[in-house]
UniProtKB/Swiss-Prot annotation:
Pfam families assigned to the protein according to its UniProt record, in alphabetical order: TXD17-like_Trx
Family per record: Belongs to the thioredoxin family.
GO CC field: cytosol; plastid
Active-site positions on this chain: C48, C51
One Gene Ontology term of the molecular function aspect: protein-disulfide reductase [NAD(P)H] activity
Species name: Arabidopsis thaliana
Domain named Thioredoxin: residues: 1-134
Protein name: Thioredoxin-like protein Clot
UniProt cross-references to InterPro entries, sorted A to Z: Thioredoxin-like_sf, TXNDC17-like, TXNDC17_dom
Cysteines joined through disulfide linkages: C48-C51
Highest taxon, organism lineage: Eukaryota
SUPFAM superfamilies in the record: Thioredoxin-like
Function comment: Probable thiol-disulfide oxidoreductase that may participate in various redox reactions.
PANTHER family in the record: 42-9-9 PROTEIN-RELATED, THIOREDOXIN DOMAIN-CONTAINING PROTEIN 17
Length: 134
């Protein structure tokens, strides 16, 4: 039906999450965070081959869902930034990221499901994340 995308980075993700929380319509919608690597300015493509493979599959799967889906695309930074052990999303207890891409079903203030880098490109694993939360 409709896939609404919002872009964020380590300094803007919290405000994007607060907007989701305060938006009355978002509370009844399906919300995701897709943690990605930044695009390489010299090529225009992500420096992460798994992200390049997963992004189109994720977008297509979410766009085909009959209900509105909101997706925050959270860009982790360039390769050296992401590789830093103290990266904010690696140490944040809500996310505990170990790789990109990571697709997270976000409900309220918490993770309700996730697919790690080696799973995020598989539609048959994305679809169960779209099921109603309990």
């Amino acid at each position: 039906m409709t896939l609404k995308k919002v872009d964020a980075n380590p300094s803007t993700l919290e405000s994007s999450l607060q907007e989701l929380k305060s938006d009355e319509t978002s509370r009844s919608k399906i919300n995701f965070i897709l943690f990605l690597a930044d695009n390489d300015p010299t090529t225009g493509q992500s420096w992460c081959p798994d992200c390049v493979r997963a992004e189109p599959v994720i977008y297509k799967t979410l766009e085909e869902f009959p209900e509105e889906v909101k997706l925050i695309r959270a860009y982790a930074g360039d390769r050296p930034t992401w590789r830093t052990p103290a990266h904010p999303w690696r140490v944040d207890s809500r996310f505990k990221l170990t790789g990109v891409p990571t697709l997270v079903r976000w409900d309220g203030d918490s993770v309700k499901g996730r697919l790690e880098d080696h799973q995020a490109h598989l539609p048959h694993l994305i679809l169960p994340l779209l099921a109603p939360s309990t």
